[in-house]
C-alpha cells in the first residue's frame, strides 16, 4: 500500500539498528543511494526528506544519503552517485555490497508482485560489488533463479567493424538515425561539410536558410537530424534539387533497444542529462525507410561501432 503521510513508514526488520551497528563496527560505511525523480514536487520532496531524517535519527548511527533527482548520469543503474560520493577514495569493492529491492524479480516474495525495476541489481553489477535483496540479506530468504529478469548485455549486440565511408562526389548528405546512434560523431569525420542541425539552430526554417546559403556559394552540406520520415526529409531534398545537387542518404541502423542503451551511455560518459525516452519512441513510430523515389540518389547503411576504451560501454544502463 502507498504511505499516507511523512510518518507512515516502518522498519523492514525490528532489529535493523543491530544489523547496521555491526557493519559499522566491522569498518563498513552505511550509504543510501536513492533515485527520487519526484523531488520536482515540493510536497513529495518534503515527505521523503522527512522520512529519511526520521530514519537516521532513530538509528542514531552515521548514515550517509545520496539522492539522484534527475534523469542523468547519477540515476541508477548509472554509477554517478557512487563516483560523486566517494570521489578518489579507495573503496574495497570485494567486501562492499549493495542491498536493494529493484532486483528484477518476476515475483517479489513479500509483495507477490514483480519488482518495479532491475536498477539496483544493475547498479551493483556496474560497480562490481555483491548484490543482495532485502529478503535474502535480512530474512535469509531466497528466490528461484528463473524468477529473475535477465540483464541483457546490449553492448554485445553491436558490430565490431564496418567498411570505411566514402562520400564520393556528393555535396548533400542527409543522415537518418535515432537519438544516440552516433550521427554527430560521424559528422566529425567529414570536416569539409557544413553541418545543418536542429540541435544547433533549433528551428527547421533556420536549417533550411543555412542550407540555401551554403549551397548557393558552392559549399557542401550534411543534415545532422534524426530525419525519420519522408516528410522530415522533404524540405531538405527540395533545397538540394533547387541547386541541382545529388543527395546521399546515410541511414544508421540502430534498434530501439540499442538507441536506449546508447543514450544512457552518452549521458554517463558526458555527465549530462538523459534524452527523454519519448524522443526515441517518436523516432521509431515515425520511421519510414528511405527510398530513391523520394528524391535520394543513393542510400548507404551504416551501424554504430564502439571505439576506444570499452570499459564504460560494457555496462548496464
Regions of interest found by a model, annotated:
Residues 173-190:
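Glycine-rich phosphate-binding P-loop
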Residues 30, 36-67, 86-90:
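Substrate-recognition/cap helix-loop segment adjacent to the acidic, metal-dependent catalytic center
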Residues 72-139, 143-154, 257-317:
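Conserved GTP-binding G-domain of TRAFAC-class P-loop NTPases and closely related GTPase folds
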Residues 185-234:
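Conserved substrate/cofactor phosphate-moiety recognition/catalytic segment
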Residues 243-263:
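Conserved phosphate-donor/acceptor-positioning beta-strand/loop module used by diverse small-molecule
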Amino acid at each position: 500500500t502507498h504511505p499516507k503521510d511523512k510518518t507512515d513508514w516502518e522498519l523492514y526488520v525490528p532489529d535493523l539498528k543491530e544489523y547496521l551497528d555491526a557493519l559499522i563496527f566491522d569498518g563498513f560505511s552505511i550509504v543510501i543511494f536513492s533515485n527520487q525523480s519526484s523531488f520536482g514536487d515540493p510536497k513529495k520532496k518534503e515527505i521523503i526528506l522527512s522520512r529519511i531524517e526520521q530514519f537516521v535519527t532513530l538509528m542514531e548511527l552515521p548514515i550517509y544519503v545520496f539522492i539522484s533527482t534527475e534523469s542523468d548520469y547519477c540515476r541508477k543503474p548509472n554509477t554517478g552517485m557512487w563516483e560523486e560520493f566517494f570521489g578518489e577514495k579507495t573503496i574495497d569493492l570485494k567486501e562492499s555490497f549493495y542491498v536493494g529491492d529493484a532486483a528484477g524479480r518476476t515475483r517479489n516474495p513479500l509483495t507477490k508482485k514483480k519488482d518495479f525495476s532491475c536498477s539496483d541489481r544493475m547498479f551493483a553489477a556496474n560497480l562490481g560489488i555483491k548484490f543482495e535483496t532485502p529478503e535474502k540479506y535480512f530474512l535469509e530468504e531466497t528466490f528461484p533463479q528463473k524468477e529473475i529478469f535477465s540483464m541483457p548485455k546490449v553492448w554485445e549486440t553491436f558490430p565490431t567493424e564496418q567498411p570505411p565511408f566514402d562520400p564520393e562526389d556528393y555535396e548533400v548528405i542527409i543522415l537518418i538515425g535515432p537519438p544516440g546512434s552516433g550521427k554527430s560523431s560521424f559528422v566529425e569525420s567529414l570536416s569539409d561539410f557544413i553541418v545543418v542541425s536542429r540541435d544547433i539552430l533549433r528551428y527547421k526554417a533556420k536549417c533550411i536558410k543555412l542550407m540555401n546559403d551554403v549551397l548557393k556559394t558552392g559549399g557542401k552540406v550534411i543534415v545532422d537530424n534524426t530525419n525519420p520520415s519522408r516528410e522530415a526529409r522533404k524540405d531538405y531534398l527540395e533545397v538540394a534539387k533547387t541547386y541541382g545537387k545529388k543527395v546521399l542518404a546515410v541511414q544508421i541502423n540502430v534498434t530501439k533497444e540499442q538507441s536506449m542503451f546508447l543514450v544512457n551511455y552518452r549521458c554517463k560518459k558526458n555527465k549530462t542529462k538523459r534524452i527523454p525516452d519519448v524522443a526515441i519512441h517518436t523516432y521509431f513510430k515515425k520511421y519510414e525507410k528511405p527510398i530513391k523515389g523520394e528524391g535520394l540518389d543513393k542510400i548507404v547503411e551504416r551501424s554504430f561501432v564502439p571505439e576506444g576504451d570499452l570499459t564504460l560501454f560494457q555496462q548496464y544502463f
